[in-house]
């Protein structure tokens, strides 16, 4: 693999295409506008669909339709746009639909600023819409991780049948760094339709697939929610990705995620050079989990 110097937003979009994403629906907003711009050029070259929606509300429901039909699909936005998508994200979570959503976070609340920020953490990791759901969430700290975890997000969204978020920020989106891309996986690109998808093949199956988040039977809704809760617990056990540095001999643990962790690492090195025993816990997968190192220091979980 050859290294290529790319801006984070464009590298993310290229990674999605190589992961088998063939449909993108979104709306431009700083600091992620290069993502839809890149898709608008590249998706037609691979037979994909790019559509700039009239709003973020429209784009998330276009995503819902593509995911329900079994396609690998993606959208991206920033704080105010992600807020507009919350009803649709809740519907996708309630329908067990895999999709990838990128939040290039900017300052808030409200329209805020276009500067990098991490203020959407709780909105993402605790489910921002109604109904007490969870999503997969990954927080890269450099452009290479932006590539790697975008690809992983598509795989895990399909595996667990749920939305997956990339939690980045304007610094990562606008930063240029050398990255390596894996070769496109032909198995992914030529994947057979998912057996639950509304793909118009009911005659071949002998039954019709219906995708909906509506369940009017209270007992059945309870069953569905319990299944999701059990799934979340399994993910918290099996899908933990965390970087721990210097935690075995430390007196103090600093916690940071995403681009800010780069700065914290430098601060820790300075402190260690001065004789302070300081360690780092960096959550990468940000669905609720506990860290053994944090538990040992009675710090609790994240």
Q: Where are the regions a protein language model picked out?
A:
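Conserved small/polar residues in nucleotide/adenosyl-binding loops
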Residues: 289-294
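A general structural motif
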Residues: 113-117, 224-240, 255-264, 283-288
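Thiamine diphosphate
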Residues: 1-127, 134
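Conserved thiamine diphosphate
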Residues: 116-169
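Generic long, charged, amphipathic alpha-helical segments
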Residues: 268-288
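Conformationally flexible catalytic loops at phosphate/diphosphate-handling active centers
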Residues: 161-244
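Glycine-/acidic-rich phosphate or pyrophosphate-binding loops and their flanking alpha/beta elements
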Residues: 7-11, 229-253, 265-269
């Amino acid at each position: 693999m050859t290294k290529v110097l790319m801006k984070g937003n464009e590298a993310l979009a290229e990674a999605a295409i190589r992961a088998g994403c063939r449909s993108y629906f979104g709306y431009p907003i700083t600091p992620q506008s290069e993502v839809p711009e890149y898709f608008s050029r590249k998706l037609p070259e691979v037979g994909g669909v790019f559509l700039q929606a009239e709003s973020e509300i429209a784009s998330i429901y276009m995503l819902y339709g593509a995911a329900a039909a079994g396609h690998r699909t993606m959208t991206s936005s920033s704080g105010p746009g992600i807020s507009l998508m919350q009803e649709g994200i809740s519907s996708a979570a309630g329908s067990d639909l895999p999709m990838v959503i990128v939040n290039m976070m900017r300052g808030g609340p409200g329209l805020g600023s276009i500067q990098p920020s991490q203020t959407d953490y709780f909105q993402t990791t605790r489910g921002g819409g109604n109904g007490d759901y969870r999503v997969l969430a990954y927080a890269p700290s450099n452009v290479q991780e932006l590539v790697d975890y975008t690809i992983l997000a598509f795989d895990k969204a399909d595996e667990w049948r749920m939305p997956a978020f990339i939690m980045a920020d304007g610094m990562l989106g606008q930063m240029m760094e050398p990255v390596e891309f894996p070769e496109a996986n032909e198995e992914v690109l030529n994947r057979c339709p998912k057996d639950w998808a509304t793909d118009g093949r009911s005659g071949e199956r002998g039954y019709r697939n219906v995708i909906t988040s509506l369940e009017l039977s209270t007992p059945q809704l309870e069953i569905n929610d319990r299944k999701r809760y059990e799934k979340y617990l399994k993910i918290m056990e099996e899908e933990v990705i965390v970087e721990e540095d210097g935690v075995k001999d430390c007196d103090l643990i600093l916690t940071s995620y995403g681009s800010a962790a780069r700065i914290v690492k430098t601060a820790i090195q300075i402190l260690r050079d001065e004789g302070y025993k300081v360690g780092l816990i960096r959550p990468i997968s940000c669905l609720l989990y506990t860290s053994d190192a944090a538990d040992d220091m009675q710090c609790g979980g994240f």
